Design a protein with these regions (language model features):
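Pyridoxal 5′-phosphate
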Residues: 1-89
Length: 89
């Protein structure tokens, strides 16, 4: 069984109170709340590795491309896709 409180704890915004009650976010059609690990990773990428993928020949672009393709490979394996090219962000 899922521990709802543990899952909620991964999403910083969900610790917010609205009118003295815990926030319940039901507008996922417009955007989705991000867990702390996503927020931290995006923050790191913007601070340390902000470059275009598949376009540059400098170190930052090459590392960004490697990380992008590694993410596609992980998602490909998770969803059972045959090829990384089937994973599109």
């Amino acid at each position: 069984m899922f521990d709802v409180e543990k899952i909620r704890a991964d999403f910083p915004l969900l610790s917010t109170e609205v009118y003295g009650r815990p926030l319940v976010y039901l507008d996922s059609g417009a955007t989705a709340q991000k867990p702390r690990c996503v927020i931290d990773t995006v923050d790191y990428l913007h601070r340390e590795l902000n470059a275009n993928i598949h376009r540059g020949v400098h170190r930052l672009a090459e590392e960004a491309t490697e990380r992008y393709e590694a993410a596609r490979d992980r998602i490909r394996a998770f969803i059972g896709a045959a090829h990384r090219e089937e994973v599109v962000f």
